[in-house]
Amino acid sequence: MDTVRIAVVGAGVMGLSTAVCIFKLVPGCSITVISDKFTPETTSDVAAGMLIPPVYPDTPIHKQKQWFKDTFDHLFAIANSAEAKDAGVLLVSGWQIFQSAPTEEVPFWADVVLGFRKMTKNELKKFPQHVCGQAFTTLKCEGPTYLPWLEKRVKGSGGLVLTRRVEDLWELHPSFNIVVNCSGLGSKQLVGDMEIFPVRGQVLKVQAPWVKHFIRDGSGLTYIYPGIANVTLGGTRQKGDWNLSPNAEISKQILSRCCALEPSLRGACDIREKVGLRPSRPGVRLEKELLVQGSQRLPVVHNYGHGSGGIAMHWGTALEAARLVSECVQALRTPAPKSKL
């Protein structure tokens, strides 16, 4: 088999980054990214994009740390390059604050971010309702800028992009030899995954250019994340809620919570509401599967279910998915042993 034809289903940060990584790791393949939604209509476009990872209960910590480190290193290199502005990647310093001491004093990612330390008493004076905190510098990756940048890289490597809704992975056979499933919440219908569910997130994008430091409540529910063009204020975590329409009452609550941490936000203007549905499950699904229909076989690599950690973990999981694709390609190119009968 000469050129292996690969379809990547999904064009959020997972689909596009996985396509880029496959081009890097798997020579002699053609890649088509297929999705019914492209930027600016993906969940990744709404994501705050801060590299502060969640913890996945069903995934070993050493694996989560590797995914995060791979992602941090990749984005740090971009932040230190001439591409930073076009890719929407920047370094941001700030504080994660707690109203009671966290169970885990030092998170698993502490030595991946820059300059992680306990907050001083003087720093904590800014947050009288909080008893302790952590100061560090991390990266912010802005979906509406980063996704077109990734898409450009896919096309620049010879990849194709196709707007189409896929109802069944078998539709892609035999046009494609391997399918990579990065369909996020779409996997509920597409592959019958009953473990995946939405966690609704509502945020505000505001103009407040004087806000330079991020502030994140330790619960992860209230946060202020300054970016290139605006400041993201959040948020909500509504399990099982599929509603994509902004709720005015929730917006008022978000603004009130954020102003309690940063009173100067009372002067913020041009407030815009955004809603995204995080594709959540107990652990990321990152594995190979061989679909069989009669004598037909279709190798599939799944890479979805990152919840609130999509951008924080994307490059690490994309690299791992690309390695799995490489194994599938190798299997296709290895002739089956002939029967001696």
From Swiss-Prot:
Any GO MF annotation of the entry: FAD binding
Subcellular location: Peroxisome matrix; Cytoplasm, Cytosol
GO cellular component: cytoplasm; cytosol; peroxisomal matrix; peroxisome
Motif Microbody targeting signal in this chain: 339-341
Gene3D superfamilies: D-Amino Acid Oxidase, subunit A, domain 2, NAD(P)-binding Rossmann-like Domain
Substrates-to-products reaction catalysed: D-aspartate + O2 + H2O = oxaloacetate + H2O2 + NH4(+); D-glutamate + O2 + H2O = H2O2 + 2-oxoglutarate + NH4(+)
Names of the cofactor(s): FAD
pH dependence: Optimum pH is 7.5 to 9.0.
Any single Pfam family the record assigns to this protein: DAO
EC number, UniProt record: 1.4.3.1
Entry comment describing in which tissues the protein is expressed: Expressed in epithelial cells of the renal proximal tubules (not detected in the glomeruli or renal distal tubules), liver, right atrium of heart, lung, chief cells of the gastric mucosa, choroid plexus, pia mater, brain stem, midbrain, pons, medulla oblongata, hypothalamus, hippocampus, cerebral cortex, cerebellum, ependyma, olfactory bulb and the pituitary, pineal, thyroid and adrenal glands (at protein level).
Annotated binding of FAD, by residue: 36-37, 43-44, 50, 307, 311
Keyword Oxidoreductase: yes
Keywords: Cytoplasm, FAD, Flavoprotein, Oxidoreductase, Peroxisome
Broad enzyme group: oxidoreductase
Record text on subunit structure and interactions: Homotetramer. Interacts with PEX5; the interaction is direct and required for localization of DDO to the peroxisome.
Family: Belongs to the DAMOX/DASOX family.
Name assigned to this protein: D-aspartate oxidase
Organism listed in the record: Sus scrofa (Pig)
